[in-house]
């Protein structure tokens, strides 16, 4: 992948946009579904021609669904939101079949973070969500993608094509080795419990991951 001076402005704009998208999705996973959180995500999705969040409204029921999806393991709506748990799991005849966790997925995610200077423990949000957050959680990995794209955008603005390239190359590697290999499966698992805000978030994120990977591959091939 080569980024010359004429391409820096385009790189900055594209990466800034992707950083914003990933950030909005991660924040929706880490916070109580307030009207602001929902509106932010809907605005981002709408800008991409996606209206799947247009009908979602904040409510006590939706807030309870947030708890059930992430923290109440006995709930029928609860699923695992970490790569190590989803990696070998599957949906069979409408039921989720969990396999044993794969610790190496978590370890590799941490190695990627350390390479880029990203600390998932500094993510902010609802107290329980951030205090129980694992390094290979969906929100952690999406936030990392936001971080990498932001780094690429900042480097492009600063006129540093080498740093921009390094951030985008690592972003592509993370997508290829991590998110692209489990985001769609997570979305399928989330849908088992029905079409709710969180199933739509998972599906939207999987679409974003696929789009981003396609664009990064095209950029690298130039």
Region spans (language model):
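Surface/interface-facing alpha-helical segments and adjacent flexible terminal/loop regions used
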Residues: 1-222
């Amino acid at each position: 992948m080569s980024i010359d001076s004429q391409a820096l402005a385009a790189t900055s704009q594209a990466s800034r946009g992707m950083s914003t998208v990933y950030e909005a999705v991660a924040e929706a996973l880490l916070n109580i579904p307030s009207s602001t959180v929902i509106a932010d995500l809907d605005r981002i999705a709408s800008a991409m021609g996606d209206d799947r969040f247009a009908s979602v409204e904040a409510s006590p029921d939706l807030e309870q669904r947030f708890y059930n999806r992430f923290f109440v393991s006995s709930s029928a709506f609860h699923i695992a939101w970490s790569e190590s748990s989803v990696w070998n799991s599957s949906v069979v005849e409408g039921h989720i079949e969990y396999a044993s966790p794969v610790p190496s997925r978590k370890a590799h995610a941490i190695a990627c973070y350390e390479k880029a200077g990203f600390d998932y423990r500094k993510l902010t949000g609802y107290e329980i969500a951030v205090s129980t957050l694992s390094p290979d959680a969906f929100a952690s990995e999406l936030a990392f993608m936001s971080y990498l794209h932001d780094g690429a955008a900042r480097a492009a603005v600063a006129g540093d094509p080498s740093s921009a390239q390094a951030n985008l190359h690592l972003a592509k590697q993370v997508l290829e080795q991590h998110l692209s290999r489990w985001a769609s499966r997570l979305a399928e698992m989330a849908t088992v419990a029905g079409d709710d805000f969180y199933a739509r978030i998972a599906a939207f994120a999987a679409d974003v991951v696929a789009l981003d990977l396609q664009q990064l591959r095209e950029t690298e091939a130039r």
